[in-house]
Amino acid sequence: MGSSSGSDVEAGFAKLQGEDFEYYMQTYSIILGRNSKKSTVDVDLSSLGGGMNISRHHARIFYDFQRRRFNLEVLGKNGCFVEGVLHLPGNPPIKLDSQDLLQIGDKEFYFLLPVRSILGGGPPIGPKQNVNYPVAAHYGGIGKKGGLFRGREREYYDEEEYDDDDDDDDGTGGKKMRRCDGAEGGGGYGGYGSCGSSGKASISGQLGQ
């Protein structure tokens, strides 16, 4: 059941994309950290090469229904980087935009949203089941400043459709999306905003087995 098929993709609210892993978010809230004898987390960054500075409960990504957006709550004492800015425990939750680069410990990965979520101003569809699918695979698609991977891309989405109803925010609501050509099963992973914004390096991997 933990595959990267189209049905799993459409049910996902968001995706975490690293250089050597993908994780499809299937619930409204997930915990990132490291597994211990007493408890487990949704995303075990320690096992993915996150290093020794990962707390058991290091961060939480959740959907804010009132503001219709995803947020990152920092729990671990060593904090998290979002787009190169360090955020520490006790700070207000950080708004996450598609293609934001996150770093927890030594692990870097991107936060990606599907186009359906962006167009609708909220999660695309309810989860088919309360399950998360971690997938260790390379997959085409992200672009950021000095991105981790490189590849082909094409524009396919305009930022004006993204309405987060937060005019008093930092103005980072809408972003122009790009989509990778190529990769089996359709380019751009079923419409995830995943190939970077204008003027940024793109990433393209190969679909893992």
Swiss-Prot record:
Segments of skewed composition (Polar residues)? 200-209
Q: Which domain of life is it from?
A: Eukaryota
InterPro entries referenced in this protein's UniProt entry, alphabetically: FHA_dom, Fhl1/FHA1, SMAD_FHA_dom_sf
What ranges does the record give for the region Disordered, renumbered to this chain? 157-209
One CC-aspect GO term:
nucleus
Q: What's a single GO MF annotation on this record?
A: sequence-specific DNA binding
Query: Domain FHA spans what residues?
Result: 30-87
SMART domains referenced in this protein's UniProt entry, alphabetically: FHA (SM00240)
What does the tissue specificity note say?
Expressed in roots, stems, leaves, young flower buds and open flowers.
Which Pfam families does the UniProt record give?
Answer: FHA
Q: What is the effect of changing residue 55 to A?
A: Loss of function
Q: What does this protein do?
A: Transcription regulator that may be involved in the control of the pre-rRNA processing machinery. Can rescue the phenotypes of slow growth and defective rRNA processing in the yeast fhl1 null mutant. Shows transactivation activity in yeast.
Stated name of the protein: Transcriptional activator FHA1
The source organism is: Nicotiana tabacum (Common tobacco)
**Gene, per the UniProt record:** FHA1
